[in-house]
């Protein structure tokens, strides 16, 4: 039997209900009827069962009915005058830049569609950072940057000269195209292009604020995270990929505001559908509070008169492609093709002129509707909020761009179009001045000037604004605290285990232990980190309500509201977004944290390189640990896991400092150096990428002459053979063991001595060499600078061997002083097998190193060809094997 019968057992009662609802519609309108029905739904429990099935998509009307709208707290007239000037200056900025014929680009239409939304926020919601409040964190939609510059200009925070240099940054006085903290370090906080990164970063930023609060590190409970997004941007996987996380974490400090102008760059977002409906169903289904702002106040009376319900029916069934077309036409067109669909809706507007119909506004352009939505959003407890604002792309630009597919590409406007915009928004500019594309500002004694500054003063100050360096200083550990790792280790261990020991040392340091943020993407046991579960706990905002299966074990899975580990599950992008929030906490919160995100090195830069690039832009400071690195060192996982190129990807980010250490003391020195550089007096805007391996071997102790070379990228590890040294062999990471074995074979079998070098960073050596080259080119009369690697090495033939592509060690070729230089690497797709077999397959084992050395010595006449032939035979090298790069 069905839970609810479809049979009408009392038609008379049913008719009474229908007539009652019709009466409400007739007397008070459809919105009131909807309100009553929805209220009834909330209060009709039946044996704990759901009586009314919830629909994921509500009617295409505002979520907040007119009777629930709060009074608007500002002066609408003054705000409109201010908003019009901001709109104008944003357009002038782009037009003046375009006039220079520098092909600079720039976007006009996005901000025009969102201007009212931003201004309501600036006047009534955005709290700035001040002595009493950490301030709201705002992710501004990238394409609307001219509007934010325009507001900062009338606030006297930016100058006309800066506006005139929009997208002209080389001379140091320009404004960046989009929000870029790297380029405007005292202004923008968050880079929001490429699109999709803003939403996911906002989610994990909100989570990190909760993390700080729950760990009693910083009070963040008054802060909100706003993410301004485009409806087209919501198609990015990153935009919606973590929204269930936000609901699961009950991030009621997070508000998404989606500018639903129904257009993306080329055309409609969903021309044959309704993007607002789609987003409502997706977010509502994930547990978000959804607030729709569809129609402006001019629709209120029409909706109230809609006794038949046909207007709402019409709104529900009209497609986005048609809504866009309507706003690109005129009132007569809308009367015929929208209202004219039904007699009832045609009747609703019979007394309205075409101009009145045209001026029926969308909710995202009505300050009162916007304020009501934002006010409601700020009151929601226990869940994140998304506000869907219905707007028009190119709003106010008329025939130039309003509602047109070309709106995103418009960068130039003729004098007729400029005049139209001036008149549309009543901008105080004389007709004869229009050809000069003048900016407009307010006199310091004007009502508008006083008003906008008073609003910002009430909200704590101005934004966006960014803190370049933290003032919340703390004591860093000395190198002596890592002494147990600087001496020879008693047993064979891997550098991954060394990293865990470093982490434990830092967690014992009373000055910084609370600032350490271990971050993992569900691989803690892989990396041997499970011992930290009980020690510092896994962060969970509600603690641990269940009894963990392994509770009796010492290292049981302990979740805690004050837990320190951020366990992000199988979610590399989310883990990296958490890392970015922690790595920029020094700026966003003036509370520096020290994040260590450890991951399979193959699933770092290759998988989420876009976010790591954004981290460079955002001036992140922290550590990325590429675990189980090296194509042959992670031996059993195969093609998708074998990392032979993460260091090459890392070197593309200028402020990412990368190392591939081989020994415990190297890793300890590198981490200590990183702490000093990022969190010490110099506060360098860099972050570290360090690869660690899972291969166990003997870890020797450090010598006094090694410290500088470890940090700069190379040092001489040892001489093999006191006499007859003929070759230099460079090794990196685990492959240094193969290098050392090859050096012994060369000595024992061929009486060839070697200088063995440990290269901790080919990338840093290459950058140093390039810097020296540049200096020498530009300063021809001054003493030449010598690259560090050139000073350390000599003219003997050199071989470089790594577990990475040949390109990794090729980057230093120009600075190697050797008479010949050969590199061995692991180009090609990975395989699963033993380390021994893999290294033989990729031709980087000790025997191939020996052959390579003999080959280089043959070039200078130190050995003959027969020696090489015999060695190939002796070591059973298959000369007919397919090149591993091609296999």
From Swiss-Prot:
Pfam families xrefs: PDH_E1_M (PF17831), Transketolase_C_1 (PF22613), Transketolase_N (PF00456)
Keywords: Oxidoreductase, Pyruvate, Thiamine pyrophosphate
Cofactor requirement: thiamine diphosphate
Catalytic activity reported: N(6)-[(R)-lipoyl]-L-lysyl-[protein] + pyruvate + H(+) = N(6)-[(R)-S(8)-acetyldihydrolipoyl]-L-lysyl-[protein] + CO2
EC number(s) on file: 1.2.4.1
EC top class named in words: oxidoreductase
InterPro entries: PDC_E1_N, PDH/Transketolase, PDH_E1, PDH_E1_M, THDP-binding, Transketo_C/PFOR_II, Transketolase-like_C_2, Transketolase_N
UniProt-recorded Gene Ontology molecular function terms: pyruvate dehydrogenase (acetyl-transferring) activity
Function recorded in the entry: Component of the pyruvate dehydrogenase (PDH) complex, that catalyzes the overall conversion of pyruvate to acetyl-CoA and CO(2).
Quaternary data: Homodimer. Part of the PDH complex, consisting of multiple copies of pyruvate dehydrogenase (E1), dihydrolipoamide acetyltransferase (E2) and lipoamide dehydrogenase (E3).
Protein name listed in UniProt: Pyruvate dehydrogenase E1 component
Gene responsible for this protein: aceE
């Amino acid at each position: 039997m069905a839970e609810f019968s479809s049979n009408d057992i009392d038609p008379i009662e049913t008719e009474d209900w229908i007539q009652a609802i019709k009466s409400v519609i007739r007397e008070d309108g459809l919105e009131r009827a909807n309100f009553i029905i929805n209220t009834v739904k909330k209060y009709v429990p039946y044996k704990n069962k759901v009586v009314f099935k919830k629909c994921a998509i509500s009617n295409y009307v505002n979520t907040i009915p007119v009777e629930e709208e709060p009074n608007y707290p500002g002066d609408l007239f003054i705000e409109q005058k201010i908003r019009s000037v901001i709109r104008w200056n944003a357009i002038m900025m782009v037009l003046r830049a375009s006039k220079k014929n520098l092909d600079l680009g720039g976007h006009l239409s996005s901000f025009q569609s969102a201007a009212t939304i931003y201004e309501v926020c600036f006047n009534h919601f955005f709290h700035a950072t001040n002595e009493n409040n950490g301030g709201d964190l705002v992710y501004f939609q990238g394409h609307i940057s001219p509007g934010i510059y325009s507001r900062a200009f009338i606030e006297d925070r930016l100058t006309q000269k800066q506006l005139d240099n929009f997208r002209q940054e080389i001379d140091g006085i320009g404004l960046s195209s989009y929000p870029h903290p790297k380029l405007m370090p005292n202004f923008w906080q968050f880079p929001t292009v490429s699109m999709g990164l803003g939403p996911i970063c906002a989610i994990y930023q909100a989570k990190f604020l909760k993390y700080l609060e729950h760990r009693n590190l910083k009070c963040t409970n008054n802060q909100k995270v706003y993410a301004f997004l485009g409806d087209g941007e919501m198609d990015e996987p990153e935009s919606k990929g973590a929204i269930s996380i936000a609901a699961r974490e009950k991030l009621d400090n997070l508000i998404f505001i989606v500018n639903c102008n129904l257009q993306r760059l080329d055309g409609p977002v969903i021309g044959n559908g309704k993007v607002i409906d789609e987003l409502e169903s997706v977010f509502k289904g994930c547990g978000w509070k959804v607030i729709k702002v569809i129609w402006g106040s001019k629709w209120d009376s029409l909706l109230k008169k809609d006794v038949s319900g046909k207007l709402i029916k019409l709104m529900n069934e009209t497609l986005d492609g048609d809504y866009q077309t309507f706003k690109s036409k005129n009132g007569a067109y809308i009367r015929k093709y929208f209202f004219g669909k039904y007699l009832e809706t045609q009747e609703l507007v019979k007394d309205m002129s075409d101009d009145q119909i045209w001026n029926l506004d969308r909710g995202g352009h009505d300050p009162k509707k916007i304020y009501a939505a934002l006010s409601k959003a700020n009151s929601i407890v226990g869940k994140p909020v998304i506000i869907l604002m219905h707007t028009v792309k190119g709003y106010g630009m008329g025939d130039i761009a309003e509602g047109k597919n070309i709106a995103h590409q418009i960068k130039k406007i003729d004098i007729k179009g400029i005049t139209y915009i001036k008149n549309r928004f009543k901008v105080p500019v004389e007709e004869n001045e229009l050809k000069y594309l003048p900016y407009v500002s307010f006199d310091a004694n004007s009502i508008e000037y006083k008003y906008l500054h008073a609003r910002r003063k009430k909200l704590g100050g101005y934004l966006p604004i960014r803190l370049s360096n933290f003032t919340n200083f703390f004591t860093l550990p000395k190198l002596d605290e890592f002494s147990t790792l600087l001496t020879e280790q008693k047993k064979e261990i891997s550098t991954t285990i060394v990293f865990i020991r470093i982490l434990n040392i830092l967690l014992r340091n009373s000055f910084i232990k609370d600032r350490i943020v271990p971050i993992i993407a569900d691989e803690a046991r892989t990396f041997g980190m499970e011992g930290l579960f009980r020690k510092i706990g896994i962060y969970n905002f509600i603690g641990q309500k269940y009894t963990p299966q392994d509770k009796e074990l010492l290292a049981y899975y302990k979740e805690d509201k004050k837990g320190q580990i951020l366990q992000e599950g199988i979610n590399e992008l989310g883990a990296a977004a958490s890392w970015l929030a922690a790595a920029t906490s020094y700026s966003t919160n003036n509370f520096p944290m020290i994040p260590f995100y450890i991951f399979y090195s193959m699933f770092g830069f290759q998988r989420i390189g876009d976010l790591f690039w954004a981290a460079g832009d955002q001036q992140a400071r922290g550590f990325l640990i590429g675990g189980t690195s090296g194509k042959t060192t992670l031996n059993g996982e195969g093609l998708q896991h074998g990392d032979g190129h993460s260091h090459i990807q890392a070197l593309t980010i200028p402020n990412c400092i990368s190392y591939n250490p081989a020994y415990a003391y190297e890793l300890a020195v590198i981490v200590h150096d990183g702490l000093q550089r990022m969190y010490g007096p110099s506060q360098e805007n860099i972050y570290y990428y360090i690869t660690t391996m899972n291969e166990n071997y003997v870890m020797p102790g450090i010598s006094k002459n090694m410290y500088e070379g470890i940090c700069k990228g190379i040092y001489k590890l040892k001489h093999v053979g006191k006499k007859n040294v003929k070759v230099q062999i460079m090794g990196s990471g685990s492959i240094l063991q193969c290098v050392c074995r090859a050096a012994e074979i060369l000595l024992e079998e061929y009486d060839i001595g070697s200088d063995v070098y440990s290269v901790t960073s080919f990338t840093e050596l290459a950058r140093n060499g390039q810097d020296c080259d540049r200096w020498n080119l530009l300063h021809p009369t001054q003493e030449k600078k010598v690259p560090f690697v050139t000073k350390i090495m000599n003219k003997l033939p050199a071989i470089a061997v790594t577990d990475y592509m040949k390109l990794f060690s090729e980057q230093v070729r120009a600075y190697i002083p050797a008479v010949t230089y050969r590199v061995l690497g692991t180009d090609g797709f990975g395989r699963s097998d033993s380390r021994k077999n893999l290294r033989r397959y990729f031709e980087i084992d000790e025997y191939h190193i020996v052959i390579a050395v003999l080959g280089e010595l043959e070039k200078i006449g130190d050995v003959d060809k027969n020696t090489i032939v015999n060695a190939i035979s002796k070591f059973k090298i298959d000369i007919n094997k397919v090149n591993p790069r091609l296999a």
